[in-house]
Amino acid sequence: MEREKIFQELKNILKDTVTVEEEEITMESDLVNDLNLDSLDLVDLALSVEQVFGFEFSDEQLQQIKTVKDVVDIIESNLYTK
């Protein structure tokens, strides 16, 4: 899957998870500071990503997530290691 398609799907997941406009979501967006996700939102996001993309985040990966780009990078690496 192309990186841009991963990003677009992640934006759709984020729009469903929290009240945020698509234009506000960039690769550099900080999930907590820019998009105002709280800890429950982050759990919902992780579960949705796992379901849509068919993999489970490792504990280490979850700790590394700060920005939208971080999530895209992890999705991409998991898709290509299958």
Curated annotation (Swiss-Prot):
Cellular component GO terms held in the UniProt record: cytosol; membrane
Keyword tags: Cytoplasm, Fatty acid biosynthesis, Fatty acid metabolism, Lipid biosynthesis, Lipid metabolism, Phosphopantetheine, Phosphoprotein
Post-translational modification: 4'-phosphopantetheine is transferred from CoA to a specific serine of apo-ACP by AcpS. This modification is essential for activity because fatty acids are bound in thioester linkage to the sulfhydryl of the prosthetic group.
SUPFAM superfamilies linked: ACP-like
Alphabetical GO biological process terms: lipid A biosynthetic process
Gene3D superfamilies: ACP-like
GO molecular function: acyl binding; acyl carrier activity
Modification O-(pantetheine 4'-phosphoryl)serine, positions: 39
Top-level lineage group: Bacteria
Carrier domain boundaries: 4-79
Protein name from the UniProt record: Acyl carrier protein
Species for this entry: Coprothermobacter proteolyticus (strain ATCC 35245 / DSM 5265 / OCM 4 / BT)
Encoding gene (name): acpP
